Every structure is written in C-alpha cells, then in structure tokens.
Design a protein with these regions (language model features):
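Accessory cap/linker subdomain of secreted extracellular hydrolases
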Residues: 1-47, 115
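Structured segments of extracytoplasmic/periplasmic soluble domains
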Residues: 35, 39, 51, 71-74, ...
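Short beta-strand/loop motif that positions the catalytic acidic residue
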Residues: 48, 54-56, 60
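Generic beta-strand/beta-sheet core signal
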Residues: 55-57, 85-87, 126, 152
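Conserved alpha/beta-hydrolase "acid-adjacent" motif
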Residues: 61-67
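Catalytic histidine neighborhood in serine/cysteine hydrolases
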Residues: 76-92
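C-terminal, loop-rich substrate-recognition/catalytic regions characterized by aromatic stacking residues
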Residues: 94-181
Length: 181
C-alpha cells in the first residue's frame, strides 16, 4: 500500500487497503486476529526445508522489518541456511545480483562457492547504494549495544529523539485517525 510500483497503487489501495485490510483488521482493539494470522508467514515455517535469502526494506509501510526478522530467526532455529538483506527503501526490492547469484548458484545448483561462509546480514546503510550493502556477522549486529532514546516535544510539526532526558517536556496529544480516505 503506497509503495512499490506506482502504476498499481490505485488498485492496491482500493482492493487491499480499503477492502481486505479495512474489513479484516480489528480496528477497535488492534488485537492479532484470524485475519492477521492468515497473513503471517511465521505460522507456515515448520515444513520449510529451503535455504532462506530474506530481503526487506527498512522503510516499508506495509510489512514492518520486525516481521522479516522473525522469519529469519525461525529459519535459523530450524537449522536452515539463511542470510538477510535490508535496504533503505519501501516494500519490495531484491538483494544485489552478485549476492543472489552466489546464493542461488550454491543452493539451487550445488556449486561450492563459499557463500555459506559469508556474512549472514547485509545492510544498506544510509545514503549507500543498494548494490553496496555493509556486511555484518548477523542481524542484529552482535557488536551493537542497546541505547535508551527519549522523546522531545515538537507538535504540531514533529518531535525528536535524544539520548538525554528532557525535564520540561510539556504535554502533547496523538490522534489515531482510523479513516483511510
């Protein structure tokens, strides 16, 4: 919805967003329901036997990156070979051809090329080309550490995030507008 091929957006908005999603989601409570369970690939992981090369956009309005990460983690837990590639765009977008070529040459054609020893995570950093992702041992990066972020006020424009706690934040209000149109 509102990403991917622009020539398909009107149809996707009308069919998926304004019909399927509007009627299937639980707008009152926001609870996970049968509609969402039926769309959750994680529920169908058990019979999977294939190597997984997962690709996802950090700026996907439709499927949160957390969802691809959960599938990636489930594949690892099942002992499947897997790598994950994250880019800075929205919904859709394949990994670089060189990465796909190495992956599929090995896992589809059995060519010994060492791809199973490559980094498990490939991240396109801010302002970098999709063809030049930064390799990491895994995702999340094992060398990363947690930090606490605090909200700053900023209505009616936008607030911000800081590592310092602001003492005089004031009060702000958020209105969740459930109407799509």
């Amino acid at each position: 919805i509102h990403s991917g091929d622009e020539s398909k957006r009107a149809y996707n908005n009308a069919t998926v967003r304004d019909d399927e999603m509007k009627n299937g989601m639980d707008r009152i409570t926001g609870d996970y329901n049968d509609f969402w369970a039926g769309r959750d690939y994680l529920n169908d992981m058990e019979p999977m036997k294939a190597a997984l090369l997962m690709s996802h956009g950090f700026n996907d309005w439709n499927v949160m990156p957390e969802h691809s990460y959960r599938i990636y983690e489930a594949a690892k837990a099942q002992g499947l070979p897997c790598q994950i590639y994250y880019h800075q765009s929205g919904h859709g977008g394949p990994p670089p051809m060189t990465l796909m070529n190495r992956w599929f040459t090995h896992y589809l054609h059995g060519v010994e090329n060492g791809v199973e020893n490559d980094s498990r995570a490939w991240i396109v950093r801010e302002n970098d080309s999709k063809e030049k992702p930064t390799p990491y041992e895994d995702f999340p990066n094992p060398e990363a550490s947690d930090i606490t972020l605090h909200l700053n006020s900023g209505a009616p424009a936008k607030g911000g995030l800081t590592t310092e706690y602001a003492k005089n934040k004031g009060n702000e209000k958020f209105v969740d507008n459930k109407f799509f149109k």
